[in-house]
Amino acid sequence: FTRYLSALKTIANDLGFKIPLVVNVHGFDQHDYAKRGLRYPIGLSQLKDTMSIPGSILAGDYYIGDLVMDNYTDVIMADALTASLQNPDQPLFSAEFQGGFQTDHPILQPTTIDLNSRLCIADGMNGINYYMFVGGYNWHDSGLFGKIHDWQAPIDINGKLRPSYHTIKTLGQTIRALGEDFLDSKTHVDVTIGWDPDIYMTEYWVKATKAMQDRLSHIREVGLFGLGRNLSLNNITYDALDLSSKPLDPKTHPTLIVVGTPWMNGPVQQKLADYVHQGGKLALINEVPTQDYYGSPCTILSEALGLTLSSVEHWGFASYDSYDSINFSELHIYEHDKGFFESHKTKATAGFLKTVGKGKVLMLGILMDHERLFKADIWASLISKLDIRSKFVTDDRVTLIERRSEKTIYLSALNLDEIRKTLSIQRNGKPLFEGHPLILQARQGLLLPLNKHLDHGVILDYSTAEL
């Protein structure tokens, strides 16, 4: 892909085009009215090396369908993984941000356009190109879908303004009211997910590698995206780090979560081992790698952390705290003295915390589907053992993400449910908004400033309404 795009860029430059090369990453799939982004890491693994082309910009192809509780966490994961690979001097960007869709299934609601935009902006996205924004015609039937190219666009074929147009316009006015200080703000994260894009390069396979592809695909969908879902459901904001090419320092990334797979190249294993010994706190989920990507034995990480596998269980039930019937797909049991998350069948425990060098390892040898919301509470409790927790406590479900500038906090509050909510929120143990409730209508989002410096020396302590 990199050689191909580099050649195209050379041809374009020779013809007089002196513009940036935008690399549009695919990966969202049609599942029904709500799409999923489970294969988005495949697109990133294919195209990450294009960032070596001078002037290239990495961008996402974001078609999520209707944004609901079932799929919004996929967007957050896509944001984090994209930002981990893009050039550092570019903004997080979607060059093909869902402003409509090529067919009328699903019929996109204006609330989806609004909530999806707000979610990505909260995640740090400073560049959005709505596609399509204006419908039109493919003359001479040149389009793949014929002449009509309406795309549910905010401005339809005949120039009529759809409700989504006014939604986008209102959001733009909200952003402008916050000023350049908001554009300079960064998303505040609580923890980092470490990942290696090559792990998810699963689009090509032969008979000899089919089992490996199936295994990695399952871990991607259940392990990686399950982790992201449970973090987001608990309002724990995360970013991502490319372990294959970026430095890993406990000072800049004090806490790291990695979803383990059977395969991991030696340099990445060594990087994680050094990280822990130097004082990093590592939560290792699922299993410890034992091979490199070519299937050769590679146990650098397990030896450095003193992790010895004793058994593996499939499809059973476990107990943890007050939960006595937690279904799992896999338990990887490593030798330890005192643990938690106990198998009903063998009484072995899959979770434990140990000190290694100057750092700590939280081993969670657990792989389980996330089909029930109570499992988010379980994961919140498990990772809190490594001091990974949300800064927020709420009395009802709501998505909360902060962007911070030097002086101001910009709080995004999103209600993805179809009911009005009156929320009491605590932030860092103290009542937010001096204890006043935050009211969110059904499927509404708000972008609220805290400690906002206005004109004439006025400081706005907080607001429960948008400026």
Where are these regions (language model features)?
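Carbohydrate-binding surfaces of carbohydrate-active enzymes
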Residues: 1-30, 76, 83-467
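Glycoside hydrolase catalytic-domain groove-lining segments
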Residues: 32-105, 116
